[in-house]
UniProtKB/Swiss-Prot annotation:
Underlying gene: gcvP
CDD domains (alphabetical): GDC-P
EC code: 1.4.4.2
N6-(pyridoxal phosphate)lysine modified-residue sites: K709
Gene Ontology MF annotations: glycine binding; glycine dehydrogenase (decarboxylating) activity; pyridoxal phosphate binding
Pfam families tied to this protein: GcvP2_C, GDC-P
Family: Belongs to the GcvP family.
Tree of life domain: Bacteria
Keyword Oxidoreductase: yes
Annotated GO CC locations: cytosol; glycine cleavage complex
Keyword set, alphabetical order: Oxidoreductase, Pyridoxal phosphate
Co-factor requirement: pyridoxal 5'-phosphate
Organism from which the protein derives: Shewanella sp. (strain ANA-3)
Protein name: Glycine dehydrogenase (decarboxylating)
GO terms under biological process: glycine decarboxylation via glycine cleavage system
């Protein structure tokens, strides 16, 4: 028996060995194949010596899963979860357990990617379509998006849309009613400054006194008042003002819709439809507009089309509006949204149905009526005389009330003007009302909830005026009326899940997306009530666990990036880009150089880069790339010199979007710095840097980090994401602040970029666990294994497909690009054909046509085993053999397994299949691996053009699914 030390038996590196796909013997086999002696040797061959770190990370040692869970459990226990009545867009909710277990905690839902391959994403596309239907029904408008990041950023998007579509072309003022949530106004002001818009804040009725392109109103407002805006909206629209409304999704169940009042755009948070507060997120925002504004909508929209068999099929509609195509001309930089949370909200609506939602909303309103009636009976004065769930109280001894509230472990809202706010929610019960009476009035008030309820039933309630009571039906589609039993709901969720391919089935090799393992142990703390049920505006001394977690995570990210400070607030990668560029903008302004507004961006950049630069008020100048995919230094020098006086920054990705470590990266940074600019290094490819090099060491000034790529937060089928930024010391004073919660930085007075001070804080435990469990050595080894896997795949495939770009020593970084243009020229087979054929082999396609048209970009990540890599390689080799048959004329160019892919059960059941020049087995069982574990696409190839020409973005008849 081999003698082992106690340290070896304790297996502190067990998580590392389970996170990394290839075991030690597989790694050595792969190293031998690619021609390297060790991971360190391979690293030395790939990463330029000039940027290689000489010191190890100082994160600490790796630890076991049980140890990590115990540590983070200790942090969770430091959070005091008081009963929250703060409101302001964040409310307690009861997540149906059938949704919690089968969606939120299910890798079939949380590990999928954005549905760019709709044929293998019909399940979540249907769930998202349901979300759009809920949004349209409740707002009374025509077309909904497939979620935005939060209510405040949706408000900023609404302002931008208003400017795009308003006929008041000379107007430059956006009006914001003075009773909107303060965090919303904060984010709107930040965005308006970049666009050069003037924001005027005042009482709602004063909007007509200004020459506006748009206006924003809150329904109900932050004090709880609900107002019929019908006449005001008509007057504004007559003046070509685009009317936007921030609305409460639960209140809309009972209230007259903003669309019925004449609103053009309605948005808000869907959080209270079964999504925990999570100390600020993640939550999905809904965004709905009139049909006439559809081409100006931000974000993804799911639409109905048809497949090649003529069957209804779903896919993302009108993608030509979006950043990955339109770049700086896009409507928005929105990319990763909040699809997992939108799906949870849509399932919440499906599970409760219209009657269940009305019961919940009516109960909330009734409890608010009872609370108001009891207080008024005791002579307490209210600010508002109408309400759905919120009352605002004046004339109280604020200090005494606050002391009693804290003693009772509840949080009320205390405004600076002495007003005390109370917002009720789905979790409110009778004893809560009794406790509120005790806190607000003191003991011995003598009020009885049952008696007050009887009084309201007898006399009727006027809290919602008759003119504001919803008269039209909602959620009449059968989907919202047939799954109210848990058995049916469980099966509906499973039926949709089975239509989608996620990481729990096979690898997803999307280049630039880093679809690595989202380990179960990392996910577990997210559901804990100590993290899930915290209000983002609670007193910070109640959130000591969150505070310590954020501080530790931030310090680790500082160490990993080589920067001096981190701002956690941005709640997506695109939002991080925007936040980083804002820091650069404010830095230049502080130096009296506000004229510096030109952003240099290489041709190969992600589409979000130019879109974000445009949002930050910058002018984009594109720099060329050479034939090897590197930044053309001579072109960069010329353009930097040409615009030197106005140069703000460069945005560059490293390793490059071509999948190589550019040797000249430090020279690129120096060129920009010499001309007074800053270097923004896009963190999309950070998975190839951690432990080997860093943006700060390279010479960059600011980066965003995709925690949903490099640091293991799952993609959720299109969100959530987190995009914190790291900055050098000179930019630290200019990162995002927050008007409600002061993070305690020099930047407190800066505007916010997200609604919550720490963004989607509820998912930060995932990245914390990832880093804690791996430790310094594990993080580095993960990066090195990602390089090994990519080079193994590249070398294997290079025998069958040309590899477009390689770096030093004929190596790639963490991803490789195969060039399919010669194949297309020789055979007519396109990258789309190959992508769809991969579905038949049980794989999601790699990234198509980015950064070069006619290519596939493959990123295997460190989490995939050699067995899975070989299965993917075998599929690609088999597909190349199929292409050869087309090239040889054995199969017609318009009738072969690639052209007809993907294949469905309907295909092989069709007698007409006999006329095809290939067998049913070739169609659906093209490999031995598929025969033992088959994934069935449920639709054939989808006609995108038909869908956009016949735009339909609502629930379709159930008969279309039968």
């Amino acid at each position: 028996m081999t003698k082992q030390t106690l340290t070896q038996l304790e297996q502190h590196d067990l998580f590392l060995r389970r996170h990394i796909g290839p075991d030690s013997s597989q790694q050595q086999e792969m190293l031998n194949y690619v021609g390297a002696e060790s991971l360190d040797d391979l690293t030395a061959q790939i990463v330029p010596e000039s940027i290689r770190l000489s010191q190890e990370l100082s994160i600490g040692d790796s630890c076991g899963e049980a140890e990590g869970i115990a540590y983070i459990r200790g942090l969770a226990k430091q959070n005091q979860v008081f009963k929250s009545y703060i409101g302001m867009g964040y409310y307690g909710t009861q997540v149906p357990n059938v949704i919690l277990r089968n969606v939120f905690e299910n890798p079939g839902w949380y590990t999928a990617y954005t549905p760019y391959q709709p044929e293998i994403a019909q399940g979540r596309l249907e769930a998202i379509l349901n979300f759009q239907q809920v949004s349209m029904d409740l707002t009374g408008l025509d077309l909904a998006s497939a979620s935005l990041l939060d209510e405040a950023t949706a408000a900023a998007e609404a302002m931008a849309l208003a400017k795009r579509v308003s006929k008041a072309k000379k107007a430059n003022i956006f009006f914001v009613a003075d009773d909107v949530f303060p965090q919303t106004l904060d984010v709107v002001k930040t965005r308006a400054e970049c666009f050069g818009f003037e924001v005027v804040v005042g009482p709602a009725h004063e909007a007509v006194n200004h020459e506006l392109f748009g206006a924003l109103f809150q329904y109900s407002n932050r004090f709880g008042q609900i107002t019929d805006f019908t006449d005001l909206f008509a007057e504004l629209r007559a003046k070509n003002v685009i009317v936007t409304v921030a609305a409460d999704i639960m209140a809309l169940v009972l209230l007259k819709s903003p669309g019925a009042m004449g609103a053009d755009v309605v948005f808000g948070s869907a959080q209270r439809f079964g999504v925990p507060m999570g100390f600020g997120g993640p939550h999905a925002a809904f965004f709905v507009a009139r049909d006439e504004h559809k081409r100006s909508m931000p974000g993804r929209i799911i639409g109905v089309s048809k497949d090649t068999r003529g069957n209804r099929a779903l896919r993302m509609a009108m993608q030509t509006r979006e950043q990955h195509i339109r770049r700086e001309k896009a409507n928005s930089n929105i990319c990763t949204a909040q699809i997992l949370l939108a799906n949870m909200a849509s399932f919440y609506a499906v599970f409760h149905g219209p009657q269940g939602l009305k019961t919940i909303a009516s109960r909330i309103n009734r409890f608010t009526d009872i609370l108001a009636a009891g207080l008024q009976a005791k002579g307490v004065s209210l600010v508002n005389n109408t309400w759905f769930d919120t009352i605002s109280i004046k004339g109280l001894d604020v200090a005494a009330v606050n002391a009693r509230a804290l003693a009772a472990e509840m949080n009320l809202r205390f405004d600076a003007d002495g007003i005390v706010g109370v917002s009720l929610d789905e979790t409110t019960i009778r004893t809560d009302i009794e406790a509120l009476f005790d806190v607000i009035l003191g003991a011995g008030h003598g009020l009885d909830v049952a008696a007050l309820d009887a009084q309201i039933v007898a006399q009727g309630s006027q809290s919602i005026p008759a003119s504001l009571v919803r008269q039209d039906a909602i959620l009449s589609h059968p989907t919202f009326n047939r799954y109210q039993s848990e058995t049916e709901m469980m099966r509906y969720i499973k039926r949709l899940e089975s239509k989608d391919l996620a990481l729990n089935y096979s690898m997803i090799s999307l280049g630039s997306c880093t679809m690595k393992l989202n380990a179960a142990v990392e996910m577990i703390p997210v559901s804990w009530p100590e993290f899930a049920n915290m209000h983002p505006f609670c007193p910070l001394d109640q959130a000591k666990g969150y505070t310590q977690l954020i501080e530790e995570l931030s310090s680790w990210l500082v160490n990993v990036t080589g920067y001096d400070a981190v701002c956690i607030q941005p709640n997506s990668g695109a939002q991080g880009e925007y936040a980083g560029l804002l820091a650069i903008r404010k830095y230049h302004e502080s130096r009296g150089e506000a004229h510096r507004n030109i952003c240099l961006i290489p041709q190969s950049a992600h589409g979000t880069n130019p879109a974000s630069a445009q949002l930050a008020g910058m002018q984009v100048v594109v720099t060329a790339c050479d034939k090897q995919g590197n930044v053309d230094l001579e072109d960069l020098k010329a353009k930097a010199a040409e615009v030197a006086e106005n140069l703000s920054c460069i945005m560059i990705t490293y390793p490059s979007t071509h999948g190589v470590y550019e040797e000249s990266i430090r020279e690129i940074c120096n060129i920009v710095h010499q001309h007074g600019g800053q270097v923004y290094l896009d963190g999309a490819n950070m998975n190839a840097q951690v432990g080997l090099t860093s943006p700060g060491f390279i010479g960059a000034d600011v980066s965003h980090l995709n925690l949903h790529k490099t640091f293991a937060i799952p993609h959720g089928g299109g969100g959530p994401g987190m995009g914190p930024i790291g900055v050098k010391a000179h930019l630290a004073p200019f990162v995002a602040g927050h008007v409600v919660v002061k993070p305690g930085r020099e930047s407190d007075n800066n505007g916010a970029v997200s609604a919550a001070p720490y963004g989607s804080a509820g998912i930060l435990p995932i990245s914390w666990m990832y880093i804690k469990l791996l430790g310094s050595n594990g993080l580095k080894k993960s990066t090195q294994t990602a390089l090994l896997n990519a080079n193994y795949v590249m070398k294997k495939l290079s025998e069958h497909y040309p590899v477009l770009f390689r770096g030093r020593n004929d190596r790639v970084a963490h991803e490789c690009i195969i060039d399919l243009r010669p194949i297309k020229e020789a055979s007519g087979v396109t990258e789309m054909d190959i992508a769809k054929r991969l579905n038949d082999y049980g794989f999601h396609a790699p990234t198509m046509s980015f950064p070069v048209a006619g290519t596939l970009m493959i990123e295997p990540t460190e989490s995939e085993s050699k067995v899975e890599l070989d299965r993917f390689i075998d599929a690609m080799v088999s597909i190349r053999a199929e292409i050869a048959k087309v090239e040889a004329g054995e199969w017609p160019a318009d009738n072969n397994p690639l052209h007809n892919a993907p294949h469905t059960m309907a295909d092989i059941m069709d007698p007409a299949f006999d006329s095809r020049p290939y067998s049913r087995e070739v169609a659906v069982f093209p490999s031995a691996a598929v025969r033992t574990n088959k994934f069935w696409p449920t639709v054939n190839r989808i006609d995108d053009v038909y869908g956009d020409r016949n735009l339909f973005c609502a629930c379709v008849p159930l008969s279309d699914y039968e």
